[in-house]
UniProtKB/Swiss-Prot annotation:
This is Potassium channel toxin alpha-KTx 15.6. The modification Pyrrolidone carboxylic acid is found at Q24. Its main location: secreted. One of its GO terms (molecular function) is toxin activity.
Length: 61
């Protein structure tokens, strides 16, 4: 029974990681900081979740 709960926890963690990576939206907009991306993400995707990753804006719904 302990093995079942262990496998269930691993499955939930893997599913959450897969969904969170799949839900991000990469843009081709250059940025120098995450604060520059917020307006772009609000205008294009209606979300405030934004990060500047590798010089490009990434939006999170």
């Amino acid at each position: 029974m302990k093995a079942f709960y262990g496998m269930l926890v691993i499955f939930i963690l893997c599913s959450t990681c897969y969904i969170s990576v799949d839900s991000q939206i990469d843009t081709n907009v250059k940025c120098s900081g995450s604060s520059k991306c917020v307006k772009i993400c609000i205008d294009r995707y209606n979300t405030r979740g934004a990060k500047c990753i590798n010089g490009r804006c990434t939006c999170y719904p």
